Amino acid sequence: MKNIYLALVSILLFASCGQEPASKIENKIKVGSLGFHVSFVVPNDATERMDQFITTHEQFMRETHHLSGDQEPIVLSYSVFKSPELNNPFDPNSGETGNTLYGLTEIYSGPEGVQAHMTLGQQREAMFAELVDLTNTYCVAGLLGAPVIAAME
């Protein structure tokens, strides 16, 4: 995990070259914003653990992140999705697999927000350890510090 964090910080530092300070950036998702999206497939008998983590993470986000202003992290979007996993995602009548799908998405205007988020998150050791364990156990895809490539501007 430390190697992932170091790689992410390196990418963020490189990506920040020539960017406006956070105070001069409009708080709107646009091409070039940076974000996270992590997808989990969780057996139905383990969803209580994931739900507890989501509650803890949302509380962390509300306590430490901002929706506007100059102080990072300024989160442009934070959302969590939850749905039963269907045998055929395009056919709601296909039945369920016995798993629940979760998607966690966060978007920041630039690398400063992502970096501030990572720093604050790692300071909450129990929450971060639970995220690492859940990710190692249930994560099927993750975009970390990825640029937005299309947005409704």
How would you name each of these model-derived features?
Residues 7-13:
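Bacterial N-terminal signal peptides
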Residues 14-15, 122:
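Hydrophobic alpha-helical membrane context
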Residues 6-7, 101:
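Hydrophobic alpha-helical context, especially transmembrane and signal-peptide helices
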Residues 64-65, 127-129:
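Short catalytic/binding micro-motifs of nucleotide second-messenger systems
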Residues 99, 125-126:
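N-terminal soluble domains immediately following signal/targeting peptides that reside
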Residues 17-103, 109-119, 134-153:
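Short S/T/G/P-rich N-terminal loop/turn motif that feeds into the first structured element of a domain
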Residues 1-4:
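Positively charged n-region of N-terminal signal peptides that target proteins for export
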Residues 124, 131-133:
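Long amphipathic alpha-helical coiled-coil segments
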